[in-house]
From Swiss-Prot:
Belongs to the class-I aminoacyl-tRNA synthetase family. One of its GO terms (molecular function) is arginine-tRNA ligase activity. GO terms for cellular component: cytoplasm. It holds the Pfam family Arg_tRNA_synt_N. PANTHER family: ARGININE--TRNA LIGASE, CYTOPLASMIC, ARGINYL-TRNA SYNTHETASE. The gene is argS. GO terms for biological process: arginyl-tRNA aminoacylation. Its EC number is 6.1.1.19. Monomer. It catalyses: tRNA(Arg) + L-arginine + ATP = L-arginyl-tRNA(Arg) + AMP + diphosphate. This is Arginine--tRNA ligase.
Length: 584
């Protein structure tokens, strides 16, 4: 079942062809949901956009289009407003028919795409021997939500964790541990991730001030690269310990990922450099092998190259990212690749993509996209830090969110004189706390910085996870109070006699349109905005329309609207990685 916007678009493009010739059939009709109900449900300003090309006044173009629009089963007669806006109001009979189809459809009328794409989403990507911090939160949950939406649409999605598991820092850390804590490299449980972070800081300080230690660390890098057994064993232990800690975070956040770290691409790095040399793209600059690119300059206005092999013969992030991109396009056969990293890496990926383009590695139809995001800030507007000035550990942040949710819940339970089990309190605290953290991030336009506030994200009012969860809980409460099993309700034609009933019905039908937007523009905040508006509309409906006390057939009609709203909220929240609750 196509969403209303998709059906309107198809009819509109047929009218464009009928009005101005078949060459106009692919023109974007510029249809958008109306921002004010007095203008109907959807609007188009395509007449204004075509005026210059067609050499006609916009209003005349609009009149011609309206004459050729076949919409009797879908909309009221279109209205032309102002200089040439075309306004559309959906027919009540159309809304009723669409709702009836949704009642028995587990996917709420959203059909899988055809044909599906093979998509890779590269996200999270923490560094081995370092703790995940608040900066990893954004990549992890934005990437997860994008992957969930694409998977629901029917695409074949490979979720990749490009962990930082290679580099000179390992030589430094292994040398330090061999010297100071040799038992840590032979006993898997001898240290945890916090120990590794502390040891890394000590090793770095030692490296910066001790030339002898520098030489030892560099030798360990050589040992590691050559596959020397002791060095490889130590490296593997460090990786395994870090993975266990990462997995604890992923399990808490319900994140699925396939690890394919930087080291995976090591065998492919020499060929990257050799192929770029063969193609005549490499230029030697101060001993390094570089590709000079169009549009990239340093602060002095000089050309800024992408270095793919250092002067000492070593490789870097750019070499690895080029190898990863070529592998994903070749062996993985990806048609769309999405990189979810902070906006500070935008130039890096733009350079990598341009090199791949010039080397001829990008198929014409391939979509390669960097999905940047801004900083998480404290309430002082600065980068979020602990009171001691350190980076906030992700596990500490999640713990505090759950603790605060637990405190809020126990306070509310006491005020309501309810009695709840410890198991209930813990389950709700986990769902609300973690859901609030995810939603607070995803509800922001990812391109912007946002201020992290526990008080705001855990509030029961406003655009928050608790507000949306409570709308779902309220619907389950209606079912419990009335002794109703929504699944057993007989499908009936909806009675849309009240304005809020019609608004709610229309919004339920728009989920597919919103998911198309998210999949196209990779902006999960649009799904959040939709779910928030749906919750607001439901609460208005709940306040204004009797449900359990209504007469039939209105009672069943309103119960079915409640059920469709709950199912839409549950599905939408699941695509954000948030679980619903029966009670709060």
């Amino acid at each position: 079942m196509a969403a209303p916007l998709a059906q309107l678009r198809d009819r509109f493009q047929a009218a464009l062809a009928a009005s101005f010739g078949p060459e106009w059939a692919a023109t974007d009709p510029l249809l958008v949901p109306a921002t004010n109900p007095k203008f109907g449900d959807y609007q188009s300003n395509v007449a204004m956009s075509l005026a210059k090309q067609l050499g006609q006044p916009p209003r005349a173009i609009a009149e011609t289009l309206v004459q050729n629009l076949n919409l009797a089963d879908l909309c009221e007669p279109p209205a032309i407003a102002g200089p040439g806006f075309i306004n559309f109001t959906l027919q009540p009979s159309y809304l009723v028919a669409q709702l009836q189809q949704l009642q028995t459809d587990e996917r709420l009328g959203i059909q899988p795409v055809s044909p599906p794409q093979r998509v890779i989403v590269d996200f999270s990507s923490p560094n081995i021997a370092k703790e995940m911090h608040v900066g990893h939160l954004r990549s992890t949950i934005i990437g997860d939500s994008i992957a969930r939406v694409l998977e629901f649409q029917g695409h074949e999605v490979l979720r990749l964790n490009h962990v930082g598991d290679w580099g000179t820092q390992f030589g430094m850390l292994i040398a330090f541990l061999q010297e100071q804590y040799p038992q840590a490299l032979s006993q898997p449980d001898a240290l945890d991730i916090s120990d590794l972070v502390a040891f890394y800081k000590q090793a770095k300080a030692r490296f910066d001030e001790d030339p002898s230690f520098q030489e030892t660390a560099r030798q360990r890098v050589v040992d590691l690269q050559s596959g020397e057994a002791t060095a490889r064993q130590a490296w593997q232990l460090l990786c395994d310990q870090s993975r266990r800690e990462f997995q604890k975070i992923y399990d808490r956040l319900d994140i699925q990922l396939e690890e394919r770290g930087e080291s995976f691409y090591n065998p492919y790095l020499p060929a990257i450099v050799e192929d770029l040399r063969r193609l005549g793209l490499l230029v030697e600059d101060q001993g390094a092998q570089c590709v000079f690119l169009e549009g990239f300059q340093n602060k002095e206005g000089q050309p800024l190259p992408l270095i793919v092999q250092k002067s000492d013969g070593g490789y870097n992030y750019a070499t690895t990212d080029l190898a990863a991109l070529r592998y994903r396009l070749g062996q993985d056969q990806a048609q769309r690749i999405i990189y979810v990293t902070d906006s500070g890496q935008a130039n890096h990926f733009a350079q990598v993509f341009q090199v791949a383009q010039r080397a001829g590695w990008l198929p014409a139809a391939a979509q390669i996209e960097h999905v940047p995001f801004g900083l998480v800030q404290g309430e002082d507007g600065k980068k979020l830090k602990t009171r001691a000035g350190d980076t906030v550990r992700l596990r500490d942040l999640l713990d505090e969110a759950v603790d605060r949710a637990r405190t809020d819940l126990t306070t509310r339970i006491a005020a309501e004189e309810r009695s709840e089990t410890p198991e209930f309190i813990e389950a709700v605290a986990q769902a609300v706390g973690l859901g609030a953290v995810k939603y607070a991030d995803l509800s922001q336009n990812r391109n912007s910085n946002y201020i992290f506030s526990f008080d705001k994200m855990l509030a029961l009012q406003g655009n928050t996870a608790p507000y949306l969860l409570y709308a779902y809980v309220r619907i389950q409460g209606i079912a419990r109070k009335g002794g109703i099993d929504f699944a057993q309700l007989d499908p009936v034609a909806a009675e849309l006699t009240e304005p809020t009933e019609r608004s709610l019905a229309k919004q339920v039908l728009q989920l597919g349109e919103v998911l198309d937007e998210v999949a196209r523009d990779l902006l999960p905040n649009r799904l959040c905005s939709y779910l928030f508006e749906l919750s607001q509309t439901f609460n208005q409906f709940y306040d204004r329309c009797p449900i359990l006390n209504a007469e039939e057939p209105q009672r069943t009609s309103r119960l079915l609207l409640c059920d469709l709203t709950a199912r839409t909220l549950k599905l939408g929240l699941s695509l954000l990685g948030i679980s619903v609750l029966e009670r709060m």
